[in-house]
Regions:
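Sec-dependent signal peptide cleavage junction
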Residues: 20-33
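Solvent-exposed hydroxyl-ligand-binding patches built from regularly spaced Ser/Thr
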Residues: 33-104, 111-196
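N-terminal capping segments
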Residues: 198-312, 445-482
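Low-complexity, Gly/Ser/Thr/Pro-rich intrinsically disordered linker/tail segments
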Residues: 396-482
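Extracellular cell-wall/glycan-interacting regions and their flexible linkers
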Residues: 10-20, 87-90, 98, 157-160, ...
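Glycine-rich catalytic cores of cysteine/serine-nucleophile enzymes that process amide/ester linkages
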Residues: 224-252, 284-288, 361-424
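...with weaker cross-activation on analogous glycine-rich loops/strands in unrelated enzymes
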Residues: 313-395
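N-terminal Sec-pathway targeting helices
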Residues: 1-13, 22-23
Length: 482
């Protein structure tokens, strides 16, 4: 082969290579950034508990989004594999049904997500005060110009998958909306959707202040505004703490979900009737993974959140959510205090085994003690299922009592403070009274038992002398009553 022929061959090969590259580039999908409403898991409820449940199947889930006016089903990057079939699931842990995100899609797989609710440059939320067809929508005091491409739709939250439907501009009158903005500050999309009212807790804890008083104040912060979700504040994959459990302050998603619901909310089946169970439309995690981990807190999720907020000033560090049964013993093993199974039902305050700030792990439940009253009853805080006034099993974070009857001092204190400071909650739920024989018990051959803080050489101190105060004195002080 002479040199001219060789050059021709090389040139032909170069042209073929360039052509192949251009064709491949044209065919191969590009990364796309899209605005999307997260709707939920495709086939939610299909994977349920059982002897043959393969938990690793959650890594193969597909997810529904509302994008560009239609529902689309996509995969989501699972993150790093930490053990066979179990990944870090960073993106799944960030997604909340019915919320609006900017997402990046690569080859039909979501690679990143960003919640838009917290970005005032890209979203304006509030009540529609004025509208004019094809011209503007006024949200609060903000007048936002419409374009011919402005989308208008309605988001509906519901267990099993949220939904989105197109609506007209007249449907927006006097309703709450989220308006996303284009690069010129004009309305890109208008979502008619639920927006919670601003909530201010009646108690004021100090994140990271390691005192017994602040621990108990922190425990009261989410009372009356957080619903019970089984697996709530565990992470999505049911391995440890959710993002909410390591959030400083009450997570906004807890507040949103509580205000969205009413006395008909049930964390499981309607009327508590298991014969009517339908995993595809229930908030209960029948598949041992927690789609609604962001919406509320179960007992251990709540205590984990309280511990985190007492010991930390910033969000996002390692959390403390674990099985309720082993919480008390684990905290003792951390060097924070002592653990014992040597407890009995108290008959008076002086001889009670239950002190201020104790954490009691039952088999399958955990609660925080605010101390023993003179009559031996105990004021507690916990997240627990309780029936609503409509007979629906809901409940959540609340002040309750352990005692023989509603005449006991602890119940009277719980009732007084719940009704005074959490009236909206009390429109849905009655104050809970638990019998001592039901709430002060455990299996001897388990990790269950009572944890007490070492206030001399442990992680918490007691400069306010809460150890020697009665529950009535403690509640009065925390709520800053004269």
């Amino acid at each position: 082969m002479n040199s001219k022929t060789l050059i021709r061959v090389i040139l032909v090969l170069i042209v073929i290579a360039i052509g192949f590259f251009l064709i491949r580039r044209k065919i191969a999908p590009k990364k796309m950034e899209k605005e999307a409403v997260f709707l939920g898991v495709e086939g939610y409820g299909d994977l349920t508990k059982g002897e043959k449940l393969d938990h690793s199947l959650i890594s193969k889930f597909k997810f529904n989004f509302y994008i560009d006016g239609e529902q689309k089903t996509l995969s989501i990057n699972n993150g790093k594999e930490v053990k066979e079939g179990v990944y870090t699931f960073e993106l799944q842990n960030q997604l909340q049904e019915g919320y609006v995100y900017d997402i990046v899609i690569d080859n039909d797989t979501v690679e990143s997500v960003k919640l838009l609710d917290n970005d005032s440059k890209t979203m304006i939320s509030g009540k529609v005060n004025d509208i004019e067809q094809d011209k503007f929508v006024q949200v609060g005091e903000e007048k936002i110009e419409l374009t011919k491409n402005t989308g208008i739709c309605k988001i509906t939250w519901k267990a099993g998958n949220s939904s989105v439907e197109k609506v007209g501009i007249d449907d927006l009158k006097d309703k709450t909306v989220k308006v996303t903005l284009d690069k010129d500050g004009k309305a890109k999309n208008i979502y008619l959707t639920f927006i919670s009212e601003k909530y201010i807790s009646p108690v004021i804890p100090i994140p990271g202040e390691k005192t017994l008083k602040n621990f108990l104040t922190t425990a009261l912060q989410p009372v009356g505004t957080t619903l019970y979700i089984y697996g709530g504040s565990w992470d999505w994959q049911d391995e440890g703490s959710s993002l909410q459990a390591t959030t400083i302050g009450i997570p906004q998603s807890w507040i949103d979900f509580y205000q969205y619901q009413n006395a008909d909310y049930t964390y499981r089946e309607k009327d508590g009737n298991e014969e009517t169970k339908n995993p595809s439309s229930s908030y209960y995690p029948y598949g041992e993974w927690n789609q609604y981990c962001y919406a509320g807190a179960d007992c251990s999720g709540y205590v984990g959140w309280v511990i985190y907020n007492t010991l930390n000033k910033e969000s996002g560090k390692d959390g403390y959510v674990m099985g309720a049964t082993k919480m008390a013993k684990t905290f003792a093993e951390n060097g924070w205090g002592t653990w014992t199974q040597d407890v009995k039902i108290p008959t008076n305050r002086d001889e009670s085994d239950f002190k201020v700030g104790d954490i009691f792990s039952m088999n399958g439940h955990v609660w925080i003690s605010f101390g023993t009253c003179d009559d031996g009853s105990i004021v507690i805080a916990h997240s627990t299922p309780s029936d609503s006034i409509n007979g629906q099993p809901g409940g959540g974070i609340q002040i309750s009592a352990i005692g023989p009857s509603e005449d006991c001092e602890a119940y009277q204190l719980a009732k007084m403070y719940m009704e005074k400071y959490y009236p909206d909650w009390c429109k849905r739920y009655k104050v809970v009274l638990k019998k001592p024989e039901d709430y002060i018990k455990f299996k001897k051959d388990s990790a269950a038992g009572k944890f007490s803080w070492n206030l001399e050489n442990g992680i918490l101190t007691d400069p306010d002398d809460y150890t020697n105060k009665k529950p009535a004195e403690i509640l009065k002080d925390i709520f800053q009553e004269k």
